[in-house]
Amino acid sequence: MSTHSDSPRAWIRETAVFLTSQMFTLFGSSLVQYAILWYITLETKSGLMVTISAISGFLPAFILSPFAGVWADRYDRKKLIILSDIGIAAATLVLALFLMAGFEALWLMFVLSAVRSVGSGIQTPAINALLPQLVPQEKLTRVNGINYSLQSGLMLVAPVASGALMSMTSLQNLLFIDIITAGVAVAILVLFLHVKPHEKALQQQDSGYFEDLKLGFSYIRQHRFILHFFVFYGIIMFLIAPSAFLTPLQVTRTFSGTYWHLTVIEVVFFVGMLAGGGIMAVWGGMKNRIHTVALSGGVIGVGTLALGVVPTFWGYALFLALIGISIPAYNTPSMVLIQETVDENYMGRVFGVMSMLSSAMMPLGMMFFGPVSDRIAIEWIMIVTGVLVVLLSGGVILDRVLVAAGKQKVPVAVEAEPQEEGSESERH
């Protein structure tokens, strides 16, 4: 069941309202994310403390994502997003009050990171599953491309804004900015976003959480293209960890990098992502989603390989920008593939598993490649992972199940389950 309006102006308005609310949330969250990271880094100068902060920021979301996917299918997704925003803002307010009272213990920062991770874990499947309720299927790629451009633009501005604010005011004042932006986002959703709950949310929920979770994994297992895609997606996320996290260290070692060099590589990467999102919004990708995923994945692999061999800093920055351009071209069709082909009543659970993969595989990659980078040159890591990404992306074209799924434009239903309503549709 599609819940978006048939009126062109109506769906555009509702989508604009939703994306605007998400931009407010993302901006405030990004300010706090950078502020907490830099505060811990400058106060402790400890790699262990930074690692604990990173773990507290991703582990709760990883653990919660599958259950959050169940909630996104059982309940009103708009309300889930609103409640998680309110919860994050409340936790941020508590920390701000502690700081104002003179308590500056590091464990408070870790607790806040964990609470924010819980909120993110709850709302991410709901956000990804709500968008197809607002946007006509044929417009999903372009809208996701626009969304990536907006997010990239904010991620370009956020570290600069956070650094400027941290130099002019206290951490607790910056936390209040996040609370205000969260309040604005919630107000926009409550007052201006009008979207009906999806079909399953309107039904009486007779099954338990774990039964629904089991049905979600059963759905993934029954539809081979989802299983194949998640295996590919997870391996790619693991392999691109070096190009995502080790570039500052590589620039410092190879090009005797300064703060200026590190700023340049951050800027060119996010400018590339901004451009890539715009390209996807205009182009829309190939007719087959998997072909676009394979092409962009191959370009990411070539760019990563080039980071290991390019002799000059500006050449390095150029290939990093190329990777940035390719990220939205990879992520957008990946997201749309799920949004187009998965049954609406299972979309939250499928996105929950996808969120679990995205929140786990890159940190796992860093846990492996980080120590390795202290033993061998990062250039070799980039070369090897780049080659593997190219080969894996090329191999996707040979997967008939995935290629066939890339052509589909209608959701596939789950095989009839006696415990689950709304799944009488014939399986494709």
Regions found by a protein language model. Give the residues of each.
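Juxtamembrane intracellular "pre-TM" segments in multi-pass secondary transporters
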Residues: S2-T15, V195-V231, E415-E420
